[in-house]
Design a protein with these regions (language model features):
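Short, hydrophobic alpha-helical segments
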Residues: 37, 190-201, 218-225
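Non-catalytic, hydrophobic alpha-helical segments
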Residues: 190, 210-213
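Core catalytic loop region at the nicotinamide-binding pocket of NAD(P)H-dependent oxidoreductases
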Residues: 80, 201-205, 226-232
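Short hydrophobic/aromatic-rich beta-strand segments that constitute the beta-sheet cores
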Residues: 80-82, 106-109, 223
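C-terminal glycine/acidic-rich active-site capping loop/insertion
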Residues: 53, 57, 62, 70-75, ...
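Rossmann-like dinucleotide-binding domain that binds NAD(P)(H)
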Residues: 7-94, 98, 112, 208-211
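C-terminal capping/lid region of NAD(P)-dependent oxidoreductase domains
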Residues: 1, 222-237
Length: 237
């Protein structure tokens, strides 16, 4: 099972964001889950929650403060829970994903100043569960982990941009003020795209990947507006 979210208060952003439906642009949340699984979303259903004020609802006609969806995948028994809000929720910024497996699970940090948590199921010599001290339930350990920077995988000329940017206190940009520079991903994306052109191959992520990442959110929002009706995600190949 996987869970992903993008929480961000958009008050004061440019007018084109005013009232934007939460899951119409879900890529910051769902992309890591779909990329890690290597699967395509097949169906999705979604419910809206809470109401925004009238002037926020007016531009796009979306009344919901929060949208949460459940995604089924083609040729997979894994489901993904996806959630996003943009207005009227008292919660700090995060772009996060959690992964729950039989032997290990990963949870994004609750606060951006913290580190993520890795949970591990203790296993015996024959891969059997080691029981906890009470004899009920397996023994699970947890540890805070440091995610590597991976700047060493980039040319030196752009590797520094995983942590530094062309923006500073005198020249800020909102994606860094609230988005933390998207985790240092910008130079990795640029490098991969340029290399794909030089090597005459499809980049990772591809245009088709992007269509699914965006399309599943559009379908989710349509589901919410229709009261939670299951929507089938189009095939983009």
């Amino acid at each position: 099972f996987m869970r992903c979210a993008h929480y961000q208060d958009m008050e004061g952003w440019p007018d084109y964001w005013l009232g934007f439906p939460p899951l119409m642009h879900p890529t910051h949340a769902v992309a890591p889950c779909l990329m890690l699984l290597g699967k395509r979303p097949e169906t999705v259903y979604c419910k809206g929650s809470g109401r925004v004020r009238k002037e926020v609802e007016a531009p796009y006609g979306c009344p919901y403060a929060f949208e949460s969806a459940l995604i089924s995948l083609k040729d997979s028994d894994v489901s993904i829970e996806m959630a996003r809000f943009l207005y009227h929720v008292a919660r700090g910024y995060t772009e996060s994903f959690n992964i729950y497996g039989e032997r290990k699970s990963f949870e994004w940090q609750q606060l951006e100043s913290e580190q993520p948590v890795l949970f591990s199921m203790a296993l015996g010599a024959n891969a059997e569960h080691v029981m906890n001290d009470y004899g009920r339930g397996g023994l699970v350990t947890e540890e805070r982990i440091q995610i590597p920077d991976y700047a060493d995988r980039l040319p030196a000329e752009i590797g520094r941009f995983t942590k530094q940017t062309v923006y500073d206190d005198s020249n800020p940009h909102l994606s860094f003020l609230q988005g933390g520079g998207h985790g240092g991903s910008h130079p990795h994306l640029v490098h991969e795209f340029v290399r794909s052109i030089l090597e005459d191959r499809t980049p990772v992520p591809s245009d088709i990947d992007g269509a699914y990442w965006t399309g599943v959110g559009i379908c989710a929002h349509q589901s919410a507006m229709d009261g939670g009706v299951v929507k089938r995600v189009p095939v983009f190949e």
